[in-house]
UniProtKB/Swiss-Prot annotation:
GO cellular component: small ribosomal subunit
HAMAP family given in the database record: Ribosomal_uS7_B
Subunit-structure text: Part of the 30S ribosomal subunit. Contacts proteins S9 and S11.
Protein name: Small ribosomal subunit protein uS7
GO molecular function, one term: structural constituent of ribosome
Keyword rRNA-binding: yes
UniProt entry keywords in alphabetical sequence: Ribonucleoprotein, Ribosomal protein, RNA-binding, rRNA-binding, tRNA-binding
Family (UniProt): Belongs to the universal ribosomal protein uS7 family.
Gene: rpsG
GO biological process: translation
Record's function text: One of the primary rRNA binding proteins, it binds directly to 16S rRNA where it nucleates assembly of the head domain of the 30S subunit. Is located at the subunit interface close to the decoding center, probably blocks exit of the E-site tRNA.
Length: 157
C-alpha cells in the first residue's frame, strides 16, 4: 500500500453493446491474457443465451440482479491479537462486493463442464439467478464463516 498518495481509480468505459459499466467490468474479469474481444464474445454470447432461455428483453438488468444475488455482505479477515490469529467478520465495502461477485461468477463458470465458456457462463448466471451454482455456494460459505466467527466481531479494525 502506498504511503504517500492515494492512487486514482481508473475510469472504466461502458461496454460497446449495452453501454453498461457493470458489463464492461465483468468483461475485464472474464478476460485472460489480454484477449478482450474474446472475453466480449463470451459475455455477450452468455447473456444472449440466457435471455433466449428465460425470455428476457433486458439482459443487463438480469445480470445486475444476478450480481445482487451473489454479492457478499460480510467476510472474515485475519487479525492477530496477542499471538493468536482470529478470523474477524467485517462488512464488505460496496466496490469490493461487486468485484468479489464478478470474480466468483467467472471462476465458477470456468470450472463447469459445458463445451464453450459462453455456455458455462450462461449456465452459471442461470444457476445464480435461481440461488444455486458454485458462485452462490461460495457466497454462502463466506457468510457461514462470518457467522461462525461472530464471537470475534469486537476485534474489528
Amino acid at each position: 500500500m502506498p504511503r504517500r498518495r492515494v492512487v486514482a481509480t481508473r475510469e472504466i468505459l461502458p461496454d460497446p453493446k449495452f453501454g453498461s459499466q457493470t458489463v464492461a467490468k465483468f468483461i475485464n474479469h472474464v478476460m485472460s491474457h489480454g484477449k478482450k474481444s474474446t472475453a466480449e464474445r463470451i459475455v455477450y454470447g452468455a447473456l444472449e443465451t440466457v435471455s433466449q432461455k428465460r425470455n428476457i428483453e433486458d439482459p443487463v438488468s438480469f445480470f445486475e440482479e444476478v450480481l445482487e444475488n451473489v454479492r457478499p455482505m460480510v467476510e472474515v479477515k485475519a487479525r492477530r491479537v496477542g499471538g493468536a490469529t482470529y478470523q474477524v467478520p467485517m462488512e464488505v465495502r460496496p466496490s469490493r462486493r461487486t468485484a468479489l461477485a464478478m470474480r466468483w461468477l467467472a471462476e465458477a463458470a470456468a470450472k463447469r463442464s459445458e463445451k464453450s465458456m459462453a455456455l458455462r457462463l450462461a449456465g452459471e448466471l442461470n444457476d445464480a439467478a435461481d440461488g444455486k451454482g458454485n458462485a452462490m455456494k461460495k457466497r454462502d460459505e463466506v457468510h457461514r464463516m462470518a457467522d461462525a466467527n461472530k464471537a470475534f466481531s469486537h476485534y474489528r479494525f
